Amino acid sequence: METIKRLIWPKKEIFVGDFAIGVNRTVPVDVFQLVCRVVLRYMRTGKIECESDSLSKFVVELLKTDCAAKWEWFMKRRQGGDYIVPLSIATIPLMPLLSCTTSVRAVSVGVLGCGFSSNIPIPRLSVPRKGLLLRLAAGLALAPICALAVYATLPREKLSVYKLRTEARTHMEDEKEATDCLVVESARELKGKDGEDLLTGSRMTKVVASTGRRRRTPYAAKVAQVARAKVGYLRNTPENRLIYQRVIIEIMDKDCVRYVDRDVILPMAIGCCFVYQDGVEESAALWGSQDSLGVKXGGLVRLPGVVTQINRDIPSDVLLPQEVLEVRTGPPIAKDRNIFMVAGCPSQARFLVHNHCLKNLKRGLVERVFCVEKDGKLTRTPQPTKGSFGRLSPFRKAVCEKVGVAHRLGYDGFLSYYSGAKLRTYTRAVESLHITPVSERDSHLTTFVKAEKISTSKGDPAPRVIQPRNPRYNVELGRYLRHMESKLMKAVDDVFGETTCIKGYTADEVGAIFRRKWDRFDKPVAIGLDASRFDQHCSVEALQYEHSFYRALYPGNKLLSKLLEWQLHNKGKGYVPDGTITYKKEGCRMSGDINTSLGNYLLMCAMVHGYMRHLGINEFSLANCGDDCVLIIERRNLKRVQGTLPGYFLNLGYTMKVESPVFQLEEVEFCQAHPVQFQGGWKMVRNVRTAMSKDVHCVNNIRDLATRRAWSNAQHHGGLALSAGIPVVERFYSRFPLYDMPVKHQRIDTVTNVHKWRGSGGNYHVTPESRASFWAAFGLTGDEQVALEDRLDRWEMDLFGREGVDAHEPSILDSAVA
């Protein structure tokens, strides 16, 4: 190296007068550093630290890292278009061996008795024998050059990114955590009071500049101050330390703090969060006091049903010629419903129930069956473009091939799937079918207003209606489909390559499914797909596509085809005390159909599968619960999905809204529940505000004491099965008193609804990790969770006293941010 320097930069003597006083050499240049920088520039690696003391070691280490980065890209992130250029270059050595010859082919055409002929040259590749050795030598000469070019064009990420990712894996327990944190961001400098550099660099690039310990302390105090401003003053408890830790990590992410500095700053910043200024502790003692008014009252309150104040007619241009809606007004007879509520719960949300009357039934049919609202006006639902569902046929073919040919159930086999009141209803239908076969009249709809809990915050929404067909029709169609539902959903899962149809799983199992889905991706992002009134948007074409699944399982079955055809042309009547409504509707999913759930699963899965194939995106995960879906993708594909998904579904006749993306697992909302970590793993937990307000309301008539006991027992056992080990929610359901089981009767079968309370339960305790995860899901800090649990401990239910008055005491749930 010194010899090279002397040749390039010779010594120059400095003379003063006639005497030489020294030797001057230009500023020395480190050739090693120069070569490193040139190589790095050529290799597009960014800045990395030089840890080798010789050029040969550096080059060897660089090649190893380069090979490893390209191999990782091929194994984990490859896409079809990444390797077009390398494969094209690899074919260059074969070109000298090939020769293109042209052969002439005579083509004759006869038109109206006249013949025309012409010669068409046709190119053809061949390997001529003449000059083969020369061509082979040229190909061999090009081979090493092309091999180097192929290697140079193989895709990979920047070597600095790969090196940091590798180092992060060695120092962090969770490899996914190291991958998630590495996001490309520009470098940033933080200046001190005197203009000095506090932190230099970014999360993606390491630089030689370092930060001394005395520089880190002021930044830790500053981060702690910002964290307290975000979540407030919290007590020094394990769960609150975890909450502060999460907030501080987010702040350091935005500030691009290096990992080596984070390791020192994080514990100091967490400690600074609990160091308060003078007077803060005295003030916190006031607002943090748990000595509030006792909540003794928990009596039962009866709230009357409501009637909608909106009366709208169907515009003349909406109905098809074969569609009808006739309203006949009867005597003003009213049969009001009631909703019962337990007073004293720490939530101000209130719910009401719609009465079963003519005004509610008419508005429900007009706005939830016939019309949708667009720009303040009623209009017909959007219709699919011609051939749009035909493009989804590959999905149907793949699913049906996995299921194979099915066989129809006997009557006894169909009845074995039911128990209780539904078994008695279907048994009578089977006895009737032995006498008279099924007919078109059995497919007619009986319509009534659904008794559901309506939040008062929604104003005056359109009532929901239920439209069941005759049990005789359900029995005949159920013999074809009831036993095939699980097989079809399993086949859909196989086509997607993972669990996709979320049905029949416990809350713990669904939480574990979402954890596995989330861990599949390097940088996951979840978006909710909100299908506005999915059943109403099911057009005739959509229903025909769904029916094609069933016809493929029973090829040539005429009775099944007839039963399915009756679903395309619906006739129904609605009887209420003050009138009747008769209607005919083409298409539209009827909420009482036996294949409603299965059909919605198949339609939504098929449309999402077709959409992702349309985009050419293979890395995605779908969680489907009928019309409620969550799509998990890589962050780099987010903008493509957000920009094109609504238009694609509109071509299929569905109004689909893409909800705001979430980048943390606890923020994912699926069926009004969030994944929350607890002692046993992950569990889907209902929104705490919805659970604590909705579940103290009951739309069933619980005036008799036996039904009240059954309802309280069902809330206690079912709620704990769904929320064992979860903060706040477990304490809430434990407050429902347990009573001796009453004598079993039909009403209690309706109230208990055992199938709705599937959960693992278990003896789990609330841990600091579960409190931190609960905070990430619902925005309630550890202190707020403890305060709510203390409030619930003082809440006593009295279900057998006289009816009380609705009263509300303010709580944390009223002002906490969801």
Swiss-Prot record:
Pfam families: RdRP_3, Tombus_P33
EC class (word): transferase
Organism: Cymbidium ringspot virus
Keywords carried by this UniProt record: Nucleotide-binding, Nucleotidyltransferase, RNA suppression of termination, RNA-directed RNA polymerase, Transferase, Viral RNA replication
Note: Readthrough of the terminator UAG occurs at position 297.
Name listed for the protein in its UniProt record: RNA-directed RNA polymerase
Gene3D superfamilies per record: 3.30.70.270
EC number assigned by the record: 2.7.7.48
Functional description taken from the UniProt entry: RNA-dependent RNA polymerase that plays an essential role in the virus replication.
Protein family: Belongs to the tombusviridae RNA polymerase family.
Listed GO MF terms: nucleotide binding; RNA binding; RNA-directed RNA polymerase activity
Annotated GO biological process: viral RNA genome replication
